[in-house]
């Protein structure tokens, strides 16, 4: 009898979670939400003050992800686009990063020490990217040099959903 009660309780939790609008998709932490914005499906909207990235899915809906944003002195706002998508990217410090810390390595190849994590989605101008991270505890903070960090599971999901040319809007 106890086994049936335990099984019924477990099934209720699973069914409640699966039918919830905040259900986590594909192993990441994305939540599907109502999103009252007039943007095409596939548009990425970053709200730096919220530390959130929204992927518009259409029909008044969007997926929302928690992110890390640039330090206050490194933040930028405006329009861009997805210019390239890279799996297992190599990280190369920018000249400004190297000026701040000359001891940085020339580059870090794919692997657990790579600051870009498992995926990088390059944006159309500058050295800015939406990428994974090797410091997941930074998610929710203003910690980067202007890029947008995501948990690796989340950036892998986003990587599969966005296409080169997709519009990116970065808002306060």
Sequence positions of predicted segments:
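Exported/periplasmic cell-wall-interacting domains
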Residues: 39, 59, 71-74, 78-79, ...
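N-terminal signal peptide c-region/cleavage motif recognized by signal peptidases
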Residues: 17-21
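N-terminal, post-signal-peptide region of Sec/Tat-exported proteins
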Residues: 46-81
């Amino acid at each position: 009898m106890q086994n049936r009660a335990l099984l019924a309780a477990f099934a209720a939790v699973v069914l409640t979670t699966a039918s919830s609008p905040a259900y986590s998709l594909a192993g990441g932490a994305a939540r599907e939400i109502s999103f009252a914005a007039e943007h095409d499906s596939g548009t990425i909207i970053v709200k730096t003050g919220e530390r959130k990235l929204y992927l518009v899915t259409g029909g008044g809906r969007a997926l929302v992800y928690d992110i890390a944003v640039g330090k206050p002195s490194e933040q930028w706002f405006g329009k861009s686009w997805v210019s390239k998508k890279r799996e297992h990217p190599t990280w190369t410090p920018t000249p400004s990063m190297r000026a701040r810390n000359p001891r940085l390595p020339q580059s870090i190849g794919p692997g657990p020490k790579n600051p870009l994590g498992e995926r990088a989605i390059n944006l159309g101008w500058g050295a800015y990217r939406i990428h994974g991270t090797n410091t997941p505890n930074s998610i929710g903070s203003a910690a980067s040099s202007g890029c947008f960090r995501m948990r690796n599971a989340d950036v892998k999901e986003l990587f599969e959903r966005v296409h080169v040319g997709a519009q990116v809007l970065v808002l306060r």
